[in-house]
Amino acid sequence: MLAGGGGKGAYQIGVWKYLHECGLDQYVCAVSGTSVGALNAALFASGNYQRAEDLWLNIQPSQILSPKKISVPEIVGWIGRAGLVKGIYGVAAGAATVSMQALAAGVATMLGRRYAFSRDGLIGLIKQGLDFSAIQTSNMPCYATCLAIPECSIRRFDLRQYSEEEATTLLLASSAIPLVFDSEEFRGERYYDGGIPLVGDNVPIKPVYDLGLDCIIVVHLSQDYVIDHSLCPNAKIVEIVPQVNLGGAVNGTLDFTAAGSQWRIRQGYHDAEKVFGMFVEVAKLKRVNELFLQAFQRSEQAYQQRSQTLQAERHKQLEAQELDRFSELCKGLGITP
């Protein structure tokens, strides 16, 4: 299970790298993700680790945060269409709530320019990195979590069931951060990032738990999220939590630089090793013992076979000697045997 977190998602590639090197990734039978976690889940379902790592190591901010000129009035309309401000992003200023106009201007100022971002660059990355035919024919469910608006209801989509175009739209929707990207339309409904606080699900365990899996690996991108294990009473949840802060909004979530990806991949690998290292070493030792036992058994079998062969040869030699003695005896008695 892969949590959302924008540019911090490179951390999950590091976790995958460790599992891949140890051969543990072959035992994963379902993946689920929100936002960048959904993209990484799709990369995992595509089955090509090296392609996923190359994508993250060569990523450029301009590929994700593609400029799209937009004015403050347009941002106001955009926020209004999303239908999220009053329900989620109303900001109290004393006894009053900041108006949509003030919020829009603040967002534009925060971004440093009067524009939001298009999805053109991410669409290119999706087409470059994903093997949709592999996803569609896989036995591995691959869930993307999105938030339907304006009702703010959580929706889960198994990407195997959709065409390349529809799956791309769902991945864009799952990562459509309000105030940064526009919402996405899918089959007549509009969707935003599935990890929006309070109403979304940034750690989407439910889809894989509902499959009846008894062990779920959760790869967090934040040190703050706490999972209620009582909601999954029949499953063991193994959590991989960043041992260092992966960054905030600007230097983490919106950090789509190659340098940022490199150190987060290293950190993910390191943290996965800390969680699974003992298990892997025990498994290796068990495997060594199994190989030793198999070698011993083969040696024992070879010894038994050789012993039986020698005994058979000795028996033939004794029979031949007895036959020679009998022939000599008969000859001495003048009897023809």
Describe these PLM feature segments.
Residues M1-T34, A42-P337:
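Patatin-like phospholipase
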